[in-house]
From Swiss-Prot:
Protein family: Belongs to the LuxD family.
EC number: 2.3.1.-
Protein name per Swiss-Prot or TrEMBL: Acyl transferase
Superkingdom assignment: Bacteria
Pfam families: Acyl_transf_2
GO MF annotation: an example: acyltransferase activity, transferring groups other than amino-acyl groups
Active-site positions on this chain: 116 (charge relay system), 213 (charge relay system), 243 (charge relay system)
InterPro entries for the chain: AB_hydrolase_fold (IPR029058), LuxD (IPR003157)
The organism of origin for this protein: Photorhabdus luminescens (Xenorhabdus luminescens)
Annotated metabolic or biological route of this protein: Lipid metabolism; fatty acid reduction for biolumincescence
SUPFAM superfamilies: alpha/beta-Hydrolases
Chain's role: Acyl transferase is part of the fatty acid reductase system required for aldehyde biosynthesis; it produces fatty acids for the luminescent reaction.
GO biological process: bioluminescence; fatty acid metabolic process
Disulphide-bridged cysteine pairs: none
C-alpha cells in the first residue's frame, strides 16, 4: 500500500502477520543522475528512525541510487509495536519482510547499509537474502560487549529472573526479559556467533569503524573480517568520530561522503572508495530533513486520528 504524499519521499505500508504494519520509505534516484545497478536498503541503528537518515538518502539519491528505508516492528518510528517488545529476531523478521516486499516490486538487485545494532541483524540475515553487497557503519560485532558499554552493565550475564523490567537505552525502555531471552536462545550475543554468521560470506563487504567508538572494539571488527573466507572485504576508519555519527556536522558529512563512495565503488564491483561523488548543498539537506520530519508527524497524526 502506498500513501499519497506531497513530499519527494514516498511512504509505503507492508502488512505482515498479526495485522502489523511496516512503514517503508522510498527515495527515487535524482533525475539525470548516473545509472546504478543496485538499489540501497538502509537499516537504521537502534532507537533511530527512517528520518534520521534523510541526509544520507539525499546523498545516495543525488548519486543515482534508489534508496529504501524502513522502521522495524516494535521499535521507534512508524511501524507497529512498541520498543519494550523489541528483540533481535523481530529486527531480522522486519528486514526479511522488507526484502520480500521488494521482490514483489521486481527490485531484486540491492546492496545493504546497516549501522550500529542493525548491523548485527544484517550479519545474521545475509544467508537468507540475495544482497549484492554489504556496508556497515559502527556495526555491533559483539552484542554483549556493545550493550554493556551502552547500558553501563552486562545484563546478559544475569539470570533471566534477576533482570530488571526495563533497560534504559537513550531514554527508551527496552523490555529486559524478552530481549535477553531472545539473545540467549537464538545466539545473538557474542563475537563467536557473529563470526559463525559471516564466515562463508561471499559478497563484497565494507565495514566502517570510528576511531573514538567506545561501543565497538575495532580489533573485534578486524577479527570478524579475518575469519571471512572471502577476500572481498575491507575495513575503513571514520577518523574523529565516536559511535554517534551525527555528533557534529563535520563527522556527519564524512559519514555521508564515505558511505556514498563505498556504495558507488561496490556497485561497480570495487572495494577502493577513492571515487568522485556529487554532494547536495547544505540547504538541500536541511530542506529534505525538515520535510521528512513533517511527513513523519503527519503520518503519526493520521494514525492517531484513525485509532
Amino acid at each position: 500500500m502506498e500513501n499519497e504524499s506531497k513530499y519527494k519521499t514516498i511512504d509505503h505500508v507492508i502488512c505482515v502477520e498479526g495485522n502489523k504494519k511496516i512503514h517503508v520509505w522510498e527515495t527515487l534516484p535524482e533525475e539525470n543522475s548516473p545509472k546504478r545497478k543496485n538499489a540501497i536498503i538502509i537499516a537504521s541503528g537502534f532507537a533511530r528512525r527512517m528520518d534520521h537518515f534523510a541526509g544520507l538518502a539525499e546523498y545516495l539519491s543525488r548519486n543515482g541510487f534508489h534508496v529504501i528505508r524502513y522502521d522495524s516492528l516494535h521499535h521507534v518510528g512508524l511501524s507497529s509495536g512498541t520498543i519494550d517488545e523489541f528483540t533481535m529476531s523481530i529486527g531480522k523478521q522486519s528486514l526479511l519482510a522488507v526484502v520480500d516486499w521488494l521482490t514483489t516490486r521486481k527490485i531484486n538487485n540491492f546492496g545493504m547499509l546497516a549501522s550500529s545494532l542493525s548491523a548485527r541483524i544484517a550479519y545474521a540475515s545475509l544467508s537468507e537474502i540475495n544482497a549484492s553487497f554489504l556496508i556497515t557503519a559502527v556495526g555491533f560485532v559483539n552484542l554483549r560487549y556493545s550493550l554493556e558499554r551502552a547500558l553501563g552493565f552486562d545484563y546478559l550475564s544475569l539470570p533471566i529472573n534477576e533482570l530488571p523490567n526495563n533497560l534504559d537505552f537513550e531514554g527508551h525502555k527496552l523490555g529486559a526479559e524478552v530481549f535477553a531471552r531472545d539473545c540467549l536462545d537464538f545466539g545473538w550475543e557474542d563475537l563467536a556467533s557473529t563470526i559463525n554468521n559471516m564466515m562463508y560470506l561471499d559478497i563484497p563487504f565494507i565495514a566502517f569503524t570510528a576511531n573514538n567508538d567506545n561501543w565497538v572494539k575495532q580489533d573485534e571488527v578486524i577479527t570478524l573480517l579475518s575469519n571471512i573466507r572471502s577476500n572481498r572485504c575491507k575495513i575503513y576508519s571514520l577518523l574523529g568520530s565516536s559511535h554517534d555519527l551525527s555528533e557534529n556536522l563535520v563527522v556527519l558529512r564524512n559519514f555521508y561522503q564515505s558511505v556514498t563512495k563505498a556504495a558507488i565503488a561496490m556497485d561497480n564491483d570495487h572495494l577502493d572508495i577513492d571515487v568522485d561523488i556529487t554532494e547536495p548543498s547544505f540547504e538541500h539537506l536541511t530542506i529534505a530533513t525538515v520535510n521528512e520530519r513533517r511527513m513523519r508527524i503527519e503520518i503519526e497524526n493520521q494514525a492517531i486520528s484513525l485509532s
